[in-house]
Amino acid sequence: MKRIGVLTSGGDSPGMNAAIRAVVRKAIYHDLEVYGIKNGYQGLMDGNIEKMTLGSVGDIIHRGGTILFSARSEEFKTDEGQFRAIEQLNKHNIDGLVVIGGDGSFQGAKKLTEKGFPCIGVPGTIDNDIAGTDYTIGFDTSLNTIIDAVDKVRDTATSHERTYIIEVMGRDAGDLALWAGLAVGAESILIPEEKEDFSSIVQRLKNGHDRGKKHSIILLAEGVGSGFEFGKRIEEVAELETRVTVLGHIQRGGSPTGQDRVLASRLGARAIELLIDNQGGRMVGIQKNVLVDYTFDEVFNVEHTIDKGMYKLSKELSI
């Protein structure tokens, strides 16, 4: 193993730059050359590859986004696209690849590994929806962004005595809504993994109103449905003045938290160690603060689940 490639793919997440930095610096520490691949798998197929140095990753650990940019590619999902990618890797004499991204990115890395090119996955997604790791890079930063936004919304909700629906990201996973909801003391938390009867939500709001509560906060993951549609139903049935805030892509941006920077540094460095050991087809993760790694198949075959105890606690505290 003499040359390592690194790319970011799929949706960006705060801390990706910290992971890139760790990959580059760890590789150079072990006398390896590192090549950055811009624009994800599309850039790999197009040969958008350049050598990286210590200077390439200077002053980036605190920056959100990804200096390598990211893109989605339908062409790469085909065998032809994957062979084009391998041709570019061979052309640049790259021996192993670090892929920073989510589930879809790892599907691509698995395909390359099956075609004989070793890849290691580093989980970077704000959704925290990947099995085999307690946390993904970017989750903590996004969580804190949501908390900060909801705290501000609560100020105006209190002033105007309104019920606010806060829609957050999470198409298939409700970790962001659950963790943020518990952190801000939301009256209701709606996530894809748990179905809640609409009438019970309305009753909880009415109970609060009857005992003098003047405002309420509801956290809703986008996978549950439209915040605007839900808010309309609440207003019609509960007869409470309602407003909706969709946080959108602000959840993906911003300077990463200390936790995300440390996690990204640890996972990025571990990815290089696995490649040096001639391993491929694996994802690095963290469980109970210990670094772990699993095959891509092991990751794909286990469904990510929410913390049932935390969900139960959120229900108990929102009476």
Curated annotation (Swiss-Prot):
Allosterically activated by ADP and other diphosphonucleosides, and allosterically inhibited by phosphoenolpyruvate. It comes from the Bacteria. GO terms for biological process: canonical glycolysis; fructose 1,6-bisphosphate metabolic process; fructose 6-phosphate metabolic process. Its main location: cytoplasm. It catalyses: beta-D-fructose 6-phosphate + ATP = beta-D-fructose 1,6-bisphosphate + ADP + H(+). InterPro entries: ATP_PFK, ATP_PFK_prok-type, PFKA_ATP_prok, Phosphofructokinase_CS, Phosphofructokinase_dom, PKF_sf. Pathway: Carbohydrate degradation; glycolysis; D-glyceraldehyde 3-phosphate and glycerone phosphate from D-glucose: step 3/4. Catalyzes the phosphorylation of D-fructose 6-phosphate to fructose 1,6-bisphosphate by ATP, the first committing step of glycolysis. This is ATP-dependent 6-phosphofructokinase. The gene is pfkA.
